Each structure stands twice: as C-alpha cells, then as structure tokens.
Regions:
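Domain-level detector for secreted/extracellular nuclease and nuclease-toxin modules, and
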Residues: 1-274
Length: 274
C-alpha cells in the first residue's frame, strides 16, 4: 500500500501546521512536494511519525512520544523490513549486515531502546525508513548513544511523557554541501545518501488541568563525524535548528509557549530540572 499523505505547505514564520494530528505535541511541520511522504506507525496507539523524502530515500525527521511504558527489556529483534505505508521502490533494502563494508551502521531515528517495552512497536523501529547511515565508532556507539540513553532516562525518572524529534540534514539552509553515498551491501546497486548532520530535539511540558501551561525544549546538533566529548556540549536553540533545516518544530504548542521555549539554547541541567 502506498500512502502519500497530505503534507502541508511549510510557512515561516507562523502559519505552520502539524503534519498529521493537532493533539500530538511531538509533530513538526511538513514541506510541500510530491517526493515527501508522512507516515505514522501504530501499535494500538501511535508509535512514531516519519517525514520521508522518497527522492533521497531518507527520513528527514522522525517524531515520537516517549514514556516509561514504551521501554522495557525485550531482546533486540533480527532483520529489517519495509515500511508497509510507503511504496517499496522508495525504500532502501537494508539487512542486519548493511554498511558492514564501510564505517557506517544503521542509525535508528526512533531508537530500539525507546520502544523495547512493546514487541510490535519495537519491530516497527526496524522498518528501513527508520534508519540512515551513521558513523559507528565514536558517534552512533558513543555520543549519540549516550544522548539517547539520557533522553530515555528523563522519561523514566520523571515518570512523564516527553516528545522527541530526531532528524538529519544534508546541508543547512543556504549552504551547499557535497553529498556522499554508500550502498547497503557490496552486491547492491542502490546508492544511499549519507547525511552530513544529525539533530535531536526534546520537549517537556507542564499542565494546568488538561491545558499545557509551560514548556521547555532542548536541541542538539551534530556534524556527521567522530566525537570524544559529551552531548551536553552540543546544545543549540530550537530556533537555530529551524533556521538550518527549514522545518518548524513542536507546532502544536500554544504559540506563546513555543516562542519562549524555542528561542534560547537550554542547558542539560536546566532542562532536566524543569
């Protein structure tokens, strides 16, 4: 089944609309174009939403809620499968051995560790549309993994639902960068573009009754390279990520809260104590 969705026209500033559901706080705006697909996976409840570029065979952003019920101790499954909501011709044929002949691994957008409390949700994180080539040593298995664990720790320790966006970019708005390619295997004729940048945004909110009364965001931005320091050294404002990517994030927050939360970089310590 091919689900093209109805991506909304991106307008900046103001006028941005959620890609799927106005009640889902994790969502970003979508860009206009026939090459873009919005796909949400479900397992009795929403799992994650991916904004997918069929021309680049790349998830540009993946957004998901996260709370302690999503996390557990299920073993990591083997194998990868196509996303049934997107035409297979636009997907990379990834296996457990893909990129093993290079410096890259299959970097999850919505992590396995954020969905290993539910076998169906976990299996959906192994859709090929939920991964990109990511440098393994000292990035995927280092600073990036540490950041994923820290984000999961907030949801566990504070016993709340938080909202996460993981994204990639090939170049910043107004920038011209070389895009390099790899292949999923030595025998594959597919050329897979390698993102030059990775980012992760996290939102926490407070409620007055059922109304969002306060919000705090934190954003991280990384070049695709090896790191030896802490993710805490790589915070930027959400507004800065929006300027670099052309997306508007957390569009379902009330405008005043969104503006205040996104305008300045947040330190990890202040975010965790929110």
């Amino acid at each position: 089944m091919f689900y093209a969705g109805t991506p909304t026209v991106f307008k900046m500033p103001g006028g941005a609309q959620p890609a799927v559901n106005k009640d889902w706080l994790e969502l970003a705006s979508a860009k206009e174009g026939s090459q873009y697909v919005v796909s949400t996976t479900y397992a009795g409840e929403r799992n994650y939403t991916v904004f997918y570029d069929t021309q680049m065979t790349t998830p540009l952003w993946t957004a998901y809620p996260l709370d302690s019920s999503h996390m557990g101790s299920l073993d990591r499954p083997s194998g990868w499968s196509y996303n049934p909501n997107i035409d297979e011709k636009y997907q990379v044929r990834v296996t457990d051995g893909s990129y093993s002949n290079s410096t890259y691994s299959r970097g999850h957008m919505c992590p396995n560790g954020s969905r290993n409390g539910n076998s169906t949700m976990q299996a959906q994180t192994f859709y090929v549309t939920n991964q990109v080539p990511q440098i393994q040593n000292s990035f995927n298995n280092g600073i990036w993994s540490n950041l994923e664990n820290a984000v999961q720790g907030i949801a566990k320790s504070h016993n709340e639902e938080i909202y996460v966006v993981t994204g990639v970019a090939f170049e910043k708005e107004g920038e011209s960068r070389t895009i390099n390619y790899t292949s999923p295997s030595k025998s594959s004729s597919q050329r897979v573009p390698i993102p030059n940048y990775f980012y992760k945004l996290v939102l926490r909110v407070k409620y007055s009754g059922r109304t969002v009364s306060d919000a705090s965001c934190i954003a991280f931005w990384f070049d695709q390279k090896a790191y030896s320091d802490s993710y805490q050294n790589h915070t930027v404002s959400v507004d800065q990520v929006e300027a670099w990517t052309g997306f508007d994030f957390f569009v379902n927050l009330p405008d005043d809260l969104e503006s205040a939360a996104e305008s300045k970089p947040t330190t990890w310590s202040s975010f965790t104590s929110f």
